[in-house]
């Protein structure tokens, strides 16, 4: 989470939604300061914010979950930075790599699992993430697929005059994956059950080649019930990790005043 007292805005960084790149730019260009954890949610901010801070302009980024799941799979498969095998990053040591992450990582590598095998093994219930716990409290939501323009618009709405373009926006747009290469007909029915309620809620389409898609009522009901329980758990029972990120990360260096 980033807060700027000069421009009176709060940026809520959601995972796998360019949060590091945006946080860095807000810090360097708009006097944005790290606030709580990198991925702290609005209800956490609300508990500690002053009355004045609660009036700040709040924004976040929403990304298609079908893209997020592919991105996570590819990151685990490549493990290019060694994150999933670095004990310093494990959640029990204060990092962000959970036991569930490692279970998925091991499944992919032990079985040389394709995306379809990975998806069928781990994605059964309707998908939901921190977006549902956050976006209702936002004054503006940047759509990841339109990040370059929406980032500028968010800053303009917060009162920034002539905001600078996000440096990684064009690079991010160029990374867009062909989802049809991952979501094959083999997993079509499961994909609809898993993503249908979330995509409907946030106006995302399924693959065009699939034509008209009908989301099962059972998935919609599960999404609603599990979403409610998740909100209650996050707000009242979830034990939050340390607010200080590890050294060498963008947010961790920002917290230590060492980001240039």
Regions found by a protein language model. Give the residues of each.
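Membrane-interface amphipathic segments in extracytoplasmic regions
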Residues: 1-260
């Amino acid at each position: 989470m980033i807060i700027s007292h000069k421009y009176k805005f709060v940026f809520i960084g959601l995972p796998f939604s360019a949060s590091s790149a945006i946080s860095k730019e807000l810090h360097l260009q708009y006097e944005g300061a790290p606030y709580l954890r990198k991925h702290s949610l609005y209800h956490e901010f609300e508990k500690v914010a002053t009355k004045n801070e609660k009036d700040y302009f709040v924004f976040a980024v929403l990304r298609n979950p079908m893209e997020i799941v592919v991105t996570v799979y590819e990151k685990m498969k490549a493990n290019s930075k060694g994150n999933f095998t670095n004990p310093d990053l494990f959640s029990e040591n204060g990092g962000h790599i959970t036991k569930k992450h490692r279970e998925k990582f091991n499944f992919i590598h032990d079985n040389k699992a394709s995306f379809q095998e990975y998806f069928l093994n781990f994605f059964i219930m309707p998908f939901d993430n921190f977006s549902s716990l956050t976006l209702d409290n936002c004054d503006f939501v940047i759509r990841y697929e339109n990040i370059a323009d929406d980032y500028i618009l968010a800053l303009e709405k917060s009162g920034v005059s002539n905001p600078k373009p996000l440096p990684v926006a064009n690079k991010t747009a160029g990374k867009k994956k062909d989802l049809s290469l991952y979501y094959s007909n083999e997993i079509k029915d499961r994909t609809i059950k898993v993503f249908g309620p979330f995509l409907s809620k946030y106006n995302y389409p399924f693959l065009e080649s699939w034509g008209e898609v009908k989301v099962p009522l059972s998935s919609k009901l599960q999404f609603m019930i599990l979403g409610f329980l998740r909100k209650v758990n996050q707000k009242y029972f979830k034990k939050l990790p340390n607010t200080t990120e590890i050294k060498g990360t963008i947010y961790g260096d920002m917290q230590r005043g060492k980001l240039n």
